[in-house]
């Protein structure tokens, strides 16, 4: 059985989306990591506006706290228009968190902690990713993402 579950959420009902990611978060808690380690929820029909997506992420983080999953499950965010604070929309480093569709990546906190322990320079990863994007250049990175979008 695969350790990564991919869910394509169809529709634009945010209440159903919340129910879906909560169900998947609970499945992570209830399933051993050797069977299910992480879940990607792909959102081709909803939250295409980045600000609305960020609002949904904020609400989802609040819900994690309310259902006592804060510190157990993390939500990593990926969006076609992802933009870090203090960057311009065209800055290539934004592409480290860009994806063909909005996505919610549900991670086990314990797995993230194991990765941190196993990789002593964990804090270097974001800078290394930005360096990679800068080496590739904006034109090449945009072309790679466009190629993915054309195949979908």
Give the ranges of each region predicted by the language model.
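Expand to "…catalyze enediolate/carbanion chemistry for C-C bond making/breaking, isomerization
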Residues: 1-152
